[in-house]
Amino acid sequence: MPGPCNCIETNVCICGTGCSGKCCRCGDACKCASGCGCSGCKVVCKCSGTCACGCDCTGPTNCKCESGCSCK
Protein backbone atom coordinates (compact mmCIF):
# COMPACT_ATOMS: atom_id res chain seq x y z
CA MET A 1 0.00 0.00 0.00
CA PRO A 2 1.53 3.33 -1.03
CA GLY A 3 2.11 6.04 1.54
CA PRO A 4 -0.31 8.99 1.82
CA CYS A 5 2.18 11.32 0.16
CA ASN A 6 2.77 9.17 -2.90
CA CYS A 7 0.42 11.28 -4.99
CA ILE A 8 1.42 9.68 -8.28
CA GLU A 9 0.02 6.32 -7.15
CA THR A 10 -2.86 7.42 -4.94
CA ASN A 11 -3.87 10.65 -6.73
CA VAL A 12 -4.48 12.06 -3.25
CA CYS A 13 -2.18 14.84 -2.14
CA ILE A 14 -1.31 15.34 1.51
CA CYS A 15 1.40 17.97 1.83
CA GLY A 16 3.85 17.98 4.71
CA THR A 17 4.49 20.85 7.10
CA GLY A 18 5.30 24.13 5.43
CA CYS A 19 3.95 23.14 2.03
CA SER A 20 1.74 25.45 0.04
CA GLY A 21 -0.51 24.90 -2.96
CA LYS A 22 1.38 27.34 -5.18
CA CYS A 23 3.02 24.89 -7.58
CA CYS A 24 2.22 21.41 -8.76
CA ARG A 25 5.03 19.13 -7.64
CA CYS A 26 3.83 15.55 -7.58
CA GLY A 27 1.28 14.88 -10.26
CA ASP A 28 -1.60 16.69 -11.93
CA ALA A 29 -3.90 16.46 -8.91
CA CYS A 30 -1.30 17.51 -6.35
CA LYS A 31 -0.26 20.98 -5.30
CA CYS A 32 2.69 20.54 -2.95
CA ALA A 33 5.41 23.18 -3.03
CA SER A 34 9.03 22.33 -3.83
CA GLY A 35 9.91 22.31 -0.11
CA CYS A 36 7.33 19.66 0.72
CA GLY A 37 8.48 17.17 3.33
CA CYS A 38 6.55 14.29 1.76
CA SER A 39 8.73 11.82 -0.10
CA GLY A 40 6.11 11.35 -2.83
CA CYS A 41 6.02 15.07 -3.59
CA LYS A 42 9.42 15.22 -5.28
CA VAL A 43 9.86 15.33 -9.04
CA VAL A 44 13.02 14.91 -11.05
CA CYS A 45 13.46 18.11 -13.00
CA LYS A 46 16.96 19.53 -13.35
CA CYS A 47 17.30 23.13 -14.44
CA SER A 48 20.64 24.72 -15.24
CA GLY A 49 22.54 26.66 -12.58
CA THR A 50 20.52 27.89 -9.62
CA CYS A 51 17.28 28.08 -11.59
CA ALA A 52 14.19 26.43 -10.17
CA CYS A 53 11.65 24.27 -11.92
CA GLY A 54 8.55 26.12 -13.06
CA CYS A 55 5.07 25.61 -11.66
CA ASP A 56 3.98 23.57 -14.66
CA CYS A 57 6.65 20.94 -14.09
CA THR A 58 5.19 17.66 -12.90
CA GLY A 59 8.02 15.42 -14.06
CA PRO A 60 10.88 15.00 -16.53
CA THR A 61 8.57 14.84 -19.55
CA ASN A 62 7.24 18.37 -19.13
CA CYS A 63 10.05 20.07 -17.26
CA LYS A 64 9.70 23.85 -17.41
CA CYS A 65 12.54 25.89 -15.98
CA GLU A 66 12.42 29.56 -15.09
CA SER A 67 12.90 32.11 -17.86
CA GLY A 68 16.43 32.11 -19.24
CA CYS A 69 17.25 28.66 -17.90
CA SER A 70 17.50 25.33 -19.64
CA CYS A 71 16.30 21.91 -18.60
CA LYS A 72 18.67 18.93 -18.47
UniProtKB/Swiss-Prot annotation:
In the induction comment, the record states: By cadmium.
Tell me yes or no: is Metal-binding among this UniProt entry's keywords.
yes
Residues annotated to bind Cd(2+) 2? C19, C24, C38, C41
- Record keywords: Cadmium, Metal-binding, Metal-thiolate cluster
Name the positions where Cd(2+) 1 binds.
C15, C19, C32, C36
All disulfide bonds of the chain are: none
The organism's superkingdom is given as: Eukaryota
Decide whether keyword Metal-binding is in the record: yes
UniProt lists the family membership as follows: Belongs to the metallothionein superfamily. Type 2 family.
The protein's name in its UniProt record = Metallothionein 20-II
